């Protein structure tokens, strides 16, 4: 036999809800879910377990879409335009041309430093070479003009190429000063070195004389010529014989005014003989005749010129150097 369900028990398990539809009132019963009934019948031993269970139930009933955050573009716009909002700091970019300028300056500094270093090294090596060269010091191209000067012989203008006017030459001759070009064979800090070189030159058949000056140096003069180019040619003859020589040095000599022409012409003939140029006997006799007409005594410049002309009566390179040696006696 089937037992009938107890309506009271079934109704008690349902919730009554009155609803009015089209003017008619009806009662609707909502049956509780098993889960609800299970929750109602759940018991807890302490408050901590109850609180934890409630949190788990609340978490399971949360809508999954609530985790997502919807950005409102309008609010974002207001945020950007709000003057109270301070924008984040951004580091300024450095200009590229500044780096390029710095980089371009470095090579210039390196080149300048290299040049300065080379100049210092070169100067040091030059001083070292001068110290080990002994007493002998090679003269610079302008050393003779800058240094030679005394009552007997003195340097002319520092520029060998400078030409004096006719009036200046006439005044110099009136004062007894004769300007010519010399061949410098050496410059020494003591007389002994100059005398040694002078002996070496004369032993080889060349002309030479030492001349001490007030600057503390002693110079070796190896020849005279009235023209600069001729003096340079005489210097080349010595260079070809393994001697050091510099021609074209302007030199002033103290000679009597009435003897300057004869001295000049005799020096020209001696240079021609050394360079193997033709010398006529008539040219030698002409100078001797002009000397005989002068009132100068047979000493000093006149004696030196006459002895030089005697050597040139039989012209040759050897005779030319001997004539030069006689003329160089005037330098002292």
Swiss-Prot record:
Residues 175-250 form the SPOR domain. Appears to be degraded early in engulfment, in correlation with its loss from polar septa. Signal peptide: none annotated. Induction: Transcription is under sporulation control. It holds the Pfam family SPOR. Residues 1-10 have a biased composition (Basic residues). It is a single-pass membrane protein. Disruption phenotype: Deletion of the gene causes little impairment of spore formation. Mutant sporangia display a transient engulfment defect in which the forespore pushes through the septum and bulges into the mother cell. Ultimately, however, the mutant is able to complete engulfment. A spoIIB spoVG double mutant is blocked at the stage of sporulation septum formation and displays a strong impairment of engulfment. Residues 11-27 have a biased composition (Basic and acidic residues). The chain crosses the membrane at residues 112-132. One of its GO terms (biological process) is sporulation resulting in formation of a cellular spore. Gene3D superfamilies: Sporulation related repeat. This is Stage II sporulation protein B. The lineage of its organism: Bacteria, Bacillati, Bacillota, Bacilli, Bacillales. The gene is spoIIB.
């Amino acid at each position: 036999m089937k037992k009938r369900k107890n309506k009271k028990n079934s109704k008690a398990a349902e919730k009554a809800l009155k609803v009015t539809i089209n003017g008619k009132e009806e009662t609707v019963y909502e049956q509780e879910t098993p889960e609800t009934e299970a929750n109602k019948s759940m018991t807890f031993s302490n408050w901590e377990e109850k609180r934890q269970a409630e949190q788990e139930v609340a978490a399971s009933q949360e809508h999954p879409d609530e985790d997502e955050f919807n950005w409102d573009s309008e609010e974002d716009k207001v945020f950007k335009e709000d003057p109270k909002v301070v924008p984040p700091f951004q580091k300024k970019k450095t200009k590229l041309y500044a780096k390029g300028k710095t980089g371009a300056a470095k090579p210039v500094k390196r080149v300048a430093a290299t040049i300065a270093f080379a100049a210092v090294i070169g100067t040091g090596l030059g001083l070292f070479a001068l110290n080990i060269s002994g007493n002998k010091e090679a003269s610079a191209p302008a050393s003779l003009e800058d240094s030679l000067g005394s009552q007997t012989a003195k340097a002319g203008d520092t520029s060998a190429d400078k030409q004096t006017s006719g009036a200046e030459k006439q005044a110099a001759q009136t004062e007894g000063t004769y300007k010519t070009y010399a061949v410098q064979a050496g410059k020494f800090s003591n007389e002994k070195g100059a005398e040694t070189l002078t002996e070496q030159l004369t032993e080889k058949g060349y002309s030479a004389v030492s001349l001490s000056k007030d600057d503390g140096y002693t110079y070796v003069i190896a020849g005279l010529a009235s023209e600069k180019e001729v003096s340079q040619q005489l210097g080349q003859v010595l260079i070809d014989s393994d001697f050091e020589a510099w021609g074209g040095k302007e030199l002033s000599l103290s000679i009597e005014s009435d003897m300057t022409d004869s001295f000049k012409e005799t020096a020209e003939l001696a240079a021609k003989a050394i360079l193997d140029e033709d010398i006529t006997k008539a040219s030698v006799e002409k100078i001797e005749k002009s000397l005989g007409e002068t009132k100068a005594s047979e000493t000093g410049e006149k004696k030196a010129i006459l002895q030089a002309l005697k050597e040139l009566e039989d012209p040759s390179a050897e005779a030319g150097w001997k004539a030069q040696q006689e003329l160089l006696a005037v330098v002292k």
